């Protein structure tokens, strides 16, 4: 299975929308060219969570619809998509996902496991830490989806994160980890 991993899109309310559209078209073309089977977005589709503009909703809807038209698309929330300090506030993605009602668009808001063929996507949600779980079946390909900082992670540039919300050990039992939030 060929999986595309995207994170930290940070669509702004008013700025860079022409540039976003150009880059998004390049992403769509590449995903089609690569013939991906699955797309995963690991958080921070939005740049701000409390004051969203119609322009944000237009561009984010365009992005998510086109991703879902290409392949089944799974999205988790990042710290910019929802309000960690007020769980009763709506996040920045649910209204779009609900309005699109696209069969290939799956918003995974809570911690838990979603099985796609022989792959299990295990969401470790920053909004639902009390319900984190380990993979339920080691015969599957288990992929952790997490948006947050992780102590001890070394990036492709050699930078090592010496602080983090959680240690790297939270991913034990997973075959792969798809992250968001670390912009290096």
Provide a role label for each language-model segment.
Residues 1-4:
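Extreme N-terminal starter segment of soluble prokaryotic enzymes
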Residues 7-11, 44-45, 79-81, 125-127, ...:
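Active-site metal-binding loops of divalent metal-dependent hydrolases
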Residues 9, 13-112:
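Core catalytic region of metal-dependent phosphoesterases/phosphodiesterases
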Residues 37-39, 140-142, 175:
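Conserved acidic residues
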Residues 67, 169-170:
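Hydrophobic alpha-helical segments and their boundary regions
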Residues 81-169:
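Conserved catalytic scaffold of divalent metal-dependent phosphoesterases
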Residues 171-184:
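Contiguous mid-protein beta-loop-alpha structural module that forms a pocket-lining wall or clamp
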């Amino acid at each position: 299975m060929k999986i595309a991993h995207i994170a930290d899109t940070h669509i702004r309310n008013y700025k860079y929308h022409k540039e976003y559209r150009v880059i998004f078209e390049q992403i769509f073309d590449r995903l089609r060219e690569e013939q991906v089977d699955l797309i995963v977005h690991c958080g921070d589709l939005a740049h701000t969570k409390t004051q969203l503009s119609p322009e944000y909703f237009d561009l984010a809807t365009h992005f998510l619809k086109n991703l879902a038209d290409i392949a089944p698309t799974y999205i988790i929330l990042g710290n910019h998509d929802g309000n960690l300090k007020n769980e009763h506030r709506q996040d920045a993605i649910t209204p779009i996902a609900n309005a699109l009602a696209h069969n290939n668009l799956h918003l995974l808001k809570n911690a838990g496991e979603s099985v796609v063929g022989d792959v299990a996507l295990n969401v470790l949600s920053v909004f639902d830490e009390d319900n984190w779980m380990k993979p339920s079946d080691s015969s599957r390909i288990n992929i952790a989806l997490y948006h947050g900082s992780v102590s001890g992670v070394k990036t492709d540039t050699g930078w090592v994160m010496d602080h983090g919300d959680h240690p790297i050990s939270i991913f034990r039992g997973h075959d792969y980890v798809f992250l968001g939030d670390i912009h290096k």
